[in-house]
Amino acid sequence: MKLSQIFIGVSLGLVALSSSAELQDKNNNKKDIEVIKIKGSYFNNYQVDNASGAMRANVSLLETAQAVTVIPETIIDEQLATTLGEVLNNDASLSPGSKQRNREVFSSRGFELSSSTGYLRDGHQHWSHYQQPIETLSRVEVIKGPSSILYGQSAPGGLINMVTKQPTSTSLLEVSADTDQNGSTRFMLDAGGEIMADTNYRAVLVKQDVNFDREYQNGEKRERDRFLGSLIVEHQVSDNFIVNAYYDRTNDKAGLDTGAWLNADGDVISNEHTINDFSWAFTDITVENKGLKLTYFVNPEWQVKVGYNEQDFERQRFESSPKMPSNYQQGDSYSSNPYDRHDDWKFKTAFIDINGEVSFGGVEHNILIGANSLDYYYGQLRTSADSISYTPGQTEPMRPNVSYKTDTSLSTTEYDYYGIYFQDLMSFNERWQVAIGGRYDKQNKENADNESLLPKVGVLYHPAENSTIYVNYSEGFEPQAREHIDDVRDRNDGMKIDATTSKQIEIGAKWQVSNRLLLNAAIFDIEKSGTLISERLLDDPLFDTVTTQAGLQKHKGVELSAQGAITDKWFVITSVMYLDANYEEDAKYQGNTPVDAPEWSASLWSRYELTEQLALNAGIFYQGERFADNDNTVSKDSYSRVDVGATYQTRIMGKKVDLRLNVENLFDADYLAGGGINNVTIGDGATARFEVKTSF
């Protein structure tokens, strides 16, 4: 769709909505009755005062010695977000990476988040090798900096905690449908309420079909077909005991797009709308989560929570697997190495938290004692076909007749770990608080056992009731793939390898203005050490290499953010980050900057209420220049993307109806998002989306 068509459509839509709202106001004014206005009654949920994942306890953000961003459901709905990446755009500390193979990769403060250790769902470690079903979420918490003390192995940049919608005691039924200019559709049902006395439920159903802008070599469009079903039931056994059980299933099948290729100048080779994979390449994912959460209130001050979750993740991936040749130019031939592969991941997680408040020695203590565990299994079957040489413009090759089912050599990986943690938030008076904590962690894995002991300390000073100045020191760790160096031609063969560790010092300030706008500032210095460095030996007759744990990576930066209401009608969530990220000690990348770690990034999303029925949105998302390879030879230009939207609330046949129109990338800017030289994501052009939602 051309920009002019979108602009005209948006303009006409807004004029119509404004006229309708004005007419309704005039009609209302004719009624000679007293009207009491409640400002912000419909659009007032931008600010969140706490994050359950940051401290694993009911602690306000002003009492949390750590930078945390909470993106609420209101913003997720306003932006018509369908992927986690669209939600995380609202925090400048997160930069997008590759989207190849129908999943998303992100970096936090310049450190890539692992699919296995970078994501939580309701505090459970969550295997995130797919596009998360965000329709089940009530909010997304971005916990910044090393967080291993409470959750175990994790990246230095932080964690993403996805908090799910919970059962409601009051009746809830929302039905919505949205579509875009490419013909994509999404239908959603969100229901909740009371089943019987003391038993409530929440159910979500989603059916989505996506038509992408990019197409295959044979002219076929890439498509995606997704189904989501979720059910949570909660029963209050007694005044002190609550049982919560849940199940959800995601089926997600999509054609493969492993990303575009870049030349040495950072430009896309060939047509930016053409996919290098063949049209018969696909990924088919089925994910099931089932679990139980028990909450027991010992007394008004103390509670015990026990949680268990099983995640079964199965994926078939039939790849054409195109390979980018060296010095590739448009029209050159390239090879593809097809294969059919089946992956089976099983995540079994559990935790127990004992949390409460006690006072002794004139000090108030908010204490957390807990333990969590993970039982991990992975199995793979794979069968490969013969390599294919292809020149763009030729007829697309037929799909090879291979199947993973013919592979009889199942490749498996298994391990388990557990951790015990302690945390104490001590309040000495109205001005001073100190948070201390520690964790012992043990991993059991063949040839890769690992133990870690981690501290954490934070000091908070409150100049006033609504402000905080804090300093925080925390550590994190990520286990190595093996316990010892295993290479007879290496000088240090047999040397014990410790886990990769990270340390952070963060100084920050928080100020809650008029109980409706939260301002944050943070300065951080993160150091990741212990990565393996192998150096080649030229004149040693006995050994080829020497490997040490001398790797060092340093990321320093500043973050500023604001979230909440500026006036009764104007709401914002905005952030900016400056980042200086470098490999300080590395045999290959010494002094270089990691991929997709821009020096500057920023985000802004805002809403202005014209009337109680009509609100307008506008946002801008900026990513600075980024490197596309760790050698720092290819860079991607900076970009700014402008999004706009409008929501109109009315009643049809007595039912509340919300009409929403959004335009992403209003000015049709050309840009490259995340990914490297052979898997970069091309930003979508101007895209209009429309939603109708009704409540019963």
Residue ranges and their predicted role:
Residues 293-309, 313-321, 462, 469, ...:
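Membrane-embedded beta-barrel scaffold of Gram-negative outer-membrane proteins
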Residues 208-213, 219-223, 227-297, 310-345, ...:
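Acidic/polar loop-and-plug regions of large Gram-negative outer-membrane beta-barrel proteins
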Residues 236-240, 345, 364-366, 372-374, ...:
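Structural signature of Gram-negative outer-membrane beta-barrels, strongest in the C-terminal barrel
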Residues 13, 31-170, 507:
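Acidic, small-polar-rich N-terminal luminal/periplasmic segments of exported/outer-membrane proteins
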Residues 135-138, 149-229, 237-241, 288:
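Outer-membrane beta-barrel translocator/receptor signature
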Residues 431, 525-527, 548-631, 667-670, ...:
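Gram-negative outer-membrane beta-barrel transporters
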Residues 343, 367, 471, 595-696:
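Conserved C-terminal beta-signal and adjacent last beta-strands/turns
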Residues 251-267, 375-379, 459-506, 511, ...:
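Surface-exposed extracellular loop regions of Gram-negative outer-membrane beta-barrel proteins
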